[in-house]
């Protein structure tokens, strides 16, 4: 993947760097706990510090996308650290195809420590300074193809959803699709952008557990 070399030493702003200012408002709900915006920001900042410094070049971060707090923290952290995110489906075969095609510098998403050598290995790609996110197309034939999105495009899409649906800080949405689908990801983007909250759920709407 070669588009244009990023400006070394200049980390682009994260997607939701202002979220820490929302303090004790609830951002995320899981089966085990509630996480405030302040806690989510702190967890993301701590995780971001584990990624390679952007002064040595932006990396392509492959994240296995699941509706878990571990993934969400990794996702926000990778953006906050100034890197580019490639979302990977949790399905083994599909993930293997994307890894073989695009060779991310780091694969994460489950909150576990990053592999040894990540901080010292040079970047594998020249990444455009505006690039923030890569989403796989839904086509089932041919080589995997990616849709490129800038930070501006991601935020503009989230803002348009907020305005259209009238999302306000008191709203709470439950996840019904995994975040490697653009719709599933848009639920996270739109609600976190406007100070609302999300309930992280991995069950489909047809599963009895979804309604419990």
Where are the language model's segments positioned?
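A short N-terminal helical cap/helix-turn-helix that marks the beginning
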Residues: 2-26
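Flexible, low-complexity linker/hinge segments
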Residues: 3-10, 96, 110-131, 158
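Conserved AMP-binding/adenylate-forming core of the ANL superfamily
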Residues: 8, 24-55, 96, 152
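Hydrophobic alpha-helical segments in the ANL/AMP-binding
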Residues: 14-18, 69-87, 161-163, 182-194
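Conserved AMP-binding/adenylate-forming
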Residues: 33, 49-91, 176-178
């Amino acid at each position: 993947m070669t588009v244009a070399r990023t400006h070394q030493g200049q980390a682009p702003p994260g997607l939701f760097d202002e979220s820490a200012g929302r303090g004790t408002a609830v951002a995320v709900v899981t089966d085990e706990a509630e996480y405030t915006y302040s806690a989510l920001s702190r967890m993301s900042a701590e995780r971001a510090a584990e990624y390679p410094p952007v002064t040595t070049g932006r990396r392509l971060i492959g994240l296995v996308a699941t509706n878990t707090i571990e993934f969400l923290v990794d996702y926000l952290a990778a953006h906050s650290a100034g890197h580019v995110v490639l979302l990977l489906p949790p399905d083994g075969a599909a993930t293997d195809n994307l890894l073989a095609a695009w060779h991310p510098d780091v694969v994460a998403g489950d909150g576990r420590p990053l592999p040894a050598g990540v901080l010292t290995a040079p970047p594998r790609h020249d990444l455009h300074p505006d690039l923030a996110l890569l989403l796989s197309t839904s086509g089932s034939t041919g080589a995997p193809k990616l849709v490129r999105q800038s930070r501006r495009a991601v935020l503009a899409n989230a803002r348009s959803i907020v305005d259209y649906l009238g999302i306000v800080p008191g709203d709470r949405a439950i996840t019904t699709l995994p975040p490697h689908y653009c719709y599933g990801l848009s639920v996270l983007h739109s609600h976190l952008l406007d100070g609302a909250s999300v309930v992280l759920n991995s069950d489909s709407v047809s599963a009895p557990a979804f309604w419990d």
